[in-house]
Curated annotation (Swiss-Prot):
Record key words, sorted: Lyase
Summary of the function given for this chain in its UniProt record: Catalyzes the reaction of cyanate with bicarbonate to produce ammonia and carbon dioxide.
Species whose genome carries this gene: Burkholderia ambifaria (strain MC40-6)
Domain of life from the UniProt record: Bacteria
Gene of this entry: cynS
Protein name per its UniProtKB record: Cyanate hydratase
């Protein structure tokens, strides 16, 4: 039976254990995810406390990380989502995403509504991908794809 968390505490503690094991074993999220049948972004989000993993994937990642049966069980629970506490994020990487939404949020909203009509882009029926590509001017660029299902507002 699927179980749900009612506070973020247990999953936050598990996330600390997972990150510690990842560092101790010198693993990448990609290596941990291998063989799960899930996307790298989904598994990483689950390991960071934002999604539940199917039983097979939970057992596989737990084995790679050296986690116990309690961790396997907890990885399968539906978490209390949201990893950024109230207020403006202070982590520089997370803040840049916050800044992007501050600058481009109204533009994204206007263009989504213009192209699709009144509605939202789902973060539930959603895929995320990040690619590292060369920058023609030198260095590297991040290409981040947010792929969510459009859900129209339905008058009632």
């Amino acid at each position: 039976m699927t179980q749900s968390q009612v506070t973020p505490n247990a999953r936050e503690a598990l996330t600390e254990t997972i990150v510690d094991a990842k560092v101790r074993k010198n693993l990448t999220f990609e290596a941990i995810n291998e063989g799960t049948g899930l996307s790298l972004a989904y598994t990483t989000a689950a390991l960071l406390g934002q999604h539940a993993l199917p039983e097979k994937a939970a057992k596989l990642v737990a084995e790679r990380l050296g986690l116990d049966d309690d961790a396997v069980r907890l990885l399968q629970t539906i978490p209390v989502r949201g990893s950024i506490p109230g207020g403006v994020p202070t982590d520089p990487t997370v803040y840049r995403f916050y800044e992007m939404v501050q600058v481009y949020g109204s533009t994204l909203k206007a263009l989504v509504h213009e192209k699709f009509g009144d509605g939202i882009i789902s973060a539930i029926n959603f895929k995320l991908d990040i690619q590292k590509v060369p920058d023609p001017e030198g260095g590297e660029r991040a290409v981040i794809t947010l792929n969510g299902k459009y859900l129209p507002t339905k008058p009632f």
